Amino acid sequence: MKGEISISVRRLVEFVLRHGDIDNRHHAGADNAMQEGSRIHRMIQKRMGPEYQAEVALKMTFEEEKYFLTLEGRADGIIQMEDRVVIDEIKGTYRDPVKWKEPMPLHLAQAKCYAYIYGTQQNLSEVQVRMTYCHIPTETLRYFYLDYTMPELTAWFQGLMAAYRKWADFTWDWREIRQNSIKGLSFPFPYRDGQKELVANVYRTIYHKKKLFMEAPTGVGKTISTIYPAVQAMGQGMGEKLFYLTAKTITRTVADDTLEILREKGLHFKSVILTAKEKICFMEETECNPEYCPYAKGHYDRINDALYDLLMTEDSFSREKIEEYAAKHQVCPFEMCLDMSLFADAVICDYNYLFDPHVYLKRFFGDSVGGEYLFLIDEAHNLLERGREMYSAVLVKEDFLALRLELKKTIVSDTSGNARKSEVSGQMTLDMTGESADASILIDQTSTVFYPAENTINALSEVRHKGRRGGRSILVREGYADKMVYHLEKCNQEMLAMKRECEGCCLVEDIDSFVQPLMRLRAVMDDYLAEQEDGQLPVRDLLLDFYFEIGHFLEMYELMDENYVKYTQLGDDNSFRLKLFCVNPAANLRQCMGRGRSSILFSATFLPIQYYKKLLGGTPEDYEVYAKSVFDAEKRALFIADDVTSKYSRRSDEEYANIAAYIEEIVKNRHGNYMVFCPSYAFLYRIYAQYAERYGGEGRECLIQGESMGEVDREEFLSRFRGNDMLDLQADIAMEIEEEDSILIGFCVLGGIFSEGIDLKNDSLIGAIIVGTGLPQVCFEREILKNFFDEEGENGFDYSYRYPGMNKVLQAAGRVIRTTEDVGIIALLDERFLQGSYQRMFPREWESFEEVSLGTVAKRVERFWNEWL
């Protein structure tokens, strides 16, 4: 029996018929138009009469030599009239469609596909297509009517399918190769203790279409233990594509290496790593338009050949391979990278590509549509704060003033006789008589058209309406700079009113009076950005940045529910900001994960797991599992100090001196590399000063984490630790005596770049000394979180402070033991760790610890090292 592959109408026409340049100057409002699409569709469909069928599912299957190809989609509307059938395609746009001479080609192609499918299935002789465009700011409608005979549609459609056939053939042939290779694939290593159960849990979760929250300590092999069962599930038809989502670049590399191991064992599996545009762009600036970038010019004319070339020759689409083939075919490497995801079996990428409301992969998740996707979410403890960040929004009053000032300069320059850079003229004569495929045009003027009275603020703004409808004609001419200045001032006045009511930080309830002028401001910006093709305004870059900020703010405003808090804040420099703070992102994250079949969320520090399950979108029906550590607990000493703390009430020179003494007592018994993690930079500097003064000198080398370390500085810092790892055994023995007193100590910030995501194996790091409990600094947002979860019936202090702090502690402690051969010390220098409220958060492997004091710690450390040296 033949198998089946399917493709949506939209994806088919967008892939096969695309051509020309990449030009981001034309599409600044495209994302917002897509987000408004559902509302626009519902609004228009409700206006139609009883003969209007909305959201009609259409599907047609074609038999090919090896497979059945199914094309499916949903017509926005089908109108059954006495003398004809009309296929209605609705599109929302921020550009003014009154000025268009014809519909957008890809939009029309989509409607023609629906017309062909419906006409064929209903044995029609001809079909009329109506393209309905809605100008989102004014809700004015414009119609294009086009008539087609079925022979015309058939000839056009057959050409479209012929162009896609080689891609369909590749998809089918590769799927057969992939599935057959999975059948013979076995786990590439001997199973570690508990690892087989871990693999089974992942597979079982995918089978039942659930989410799994998994605490997977370092060493259990979490990457292979999640990827392997996911691949096996795909082999059984439970998943069409795997997404491996991470927070860090290094983790993406590990995932790619794991797939390469499976490929070496016989797996045929194509994978792509999505790289940020700023990193992969060939040009100095990411100006995606044909005038600046040669790779943008004609990109769509060449991209499909580039894709096919790479598909036929490689299975791993790394950044290097993407850059190689993009340069060869002179196409944009970033867009090529995104397109390769269509054909990859695994997509390795940042969280953003699934969860961020602006960056998510619309080709897979657009219009709230998902698929049989498997989401493997690594280091998922990071997703909570990332989620809050992605679904929060902030606007700063001073940004409104800055843009207003720059725009006023362009208006002033207009009065000097220069060309009016801030003004665009356009005219359109509307022909109401024809009804042929040359596109008859109608404008629905029943909708309210709103134009603010800008003439009250600037005589430079000219608004003249001229048109032809029953003898009348319309000409629209508007000065965009002065319109934006007007709305910027309105927004600024509303923020000024809020500022006067604010003392430091304060919660606000109603911001509708601010949002209304903000929406009008964005509408004017949309019109301007849609009209401008070569960036006439000198402040276009500043305007674009601000445009995206207010767009995000308005989108989050629409999402706001009981999981949001609105507040204003007055800065020390008198700056003022308004924030929509997403306190609990669970619903948003759950919705995103709902776009796939199953999600596996895992981390080495996922405790307490119910806390993460609740806030990361889990439900009572979802699963959680705690993987057993494979490391020998005897090779790791855990000490807890009972006589020091980082509490604010105890901070003093005496306490800093005691902590410095603890560090010395711990490191003096064994030469090697240590890291000391402090709760803040200020605390770090005090501890370092005490240690350097009392114990610094010969045999002690101290490094300090800088407050703004770049990638080069970071690697140089880590290279000092990795030096020991490069010594072979003979050299290590030879240097044992002469380096007996050599000690390297890195003073780092808890929760910073060196406390998570670094892999220091063997003797690269033999001790982590953690000062304090990692509690976040008390601030207005943390107090908002505390109060919110208190009202939810949870322990607000735990949710806001204790749990996030403990995660930082666990991450820092996890830097020490990285392999089964590693031996090392973890010292928790805060007496609060002896309290039950903290010990309840300890992982199972921390059940055995030693309570120490400044007077006893040296002997305990010495005894531990004597057992292993």
In which residue ranges do the predicted regions lie?
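Mg2+/Mn2+-dependent nuclease catalytic core
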Residues: 60-154
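Conserved RecA-like P-loop NTPase helicase motor core
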Residues: 643-654, 708-834
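A contiguous, basic/glycine-rich beta-loop/short-helix subdomain that forms a polymer-engagement track
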Residues: 322-347, 357-365, 521, 527-645, ...
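Signature of the SF2 helicase/ATPase Hel1-core->accessory helical subdomain module
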Residues: 226, 253, 329-346, 351-415, ...
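Conserved pre-motif I regulatory segment
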Residues: 173-215
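A substrate-engagement module of RecA-like helicase motors
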Residues: 179, 238-347, 352-355, 412-419, ...
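Metal-dependent nuclease catalytic cores that hydrolyze phosphodiester bonds in DNA/RNA
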Residues: 1-83
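Walker A/P-loop
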Residues: 207-229
